[in-house]
Amino acid sequence: MPRSTKKGPFFDHHLIKKVESAAGSKRPIKTCSRRSVILPQMVGHTIAIHNGKNYYPVVINENMVGHKLGEFSITRVFKGHGGDKKSGK
C-alpha cells in the first residue's frame, strides 16, 4: 500500500542537508537511510547507499525520482537454487 499523498514523500532531513552542502563536490554522500525517497534535488549526485555490509555508490538520474534509495542497493545475494543431490553416475 503506497504512502498517502497528503503526507508527502519521506526523506531524512540530515540527508537533504548533506546533498545541499555537497553541491559542487564529486565525493559520494554516504547514507544508511534506505527508506528515503529520491527527490529532484538529488539528481546528478553520487550517493553511497549502505546494504548492511558495504556502501554501494549510485549515480542519481531523473528516472529514479520518486523511488526509494534502498531499491538501488540489493541486500541479498542469490547463489542459485539447490542443485541435484544425486551423484553424477
Curated annotation (Swiss-Prot):
GO terms for biological process: ribosomal small subunit assembly; translation. It comes from the Bacteria. Gene3D superfamilies: 30s Ribosomal Protein S19, Chain A. Keywords: Ribonucleoprotein, Ribosomal protein, RNA-binding, rRNA-binding. InterPro entries: Ribosomal_uS19, Ribosomal_uS19_bac-type, Ribosomal_uS19_CS, Ribosomal_uS19_SF. Protein S19 forms a complex with S13 that binds strongly to the 16S ribosomal RNA. This is Small ribosomal subunit protein uS19. It comes from Xylella fastidiosa (strain 9a5c). The gene is rpsS.
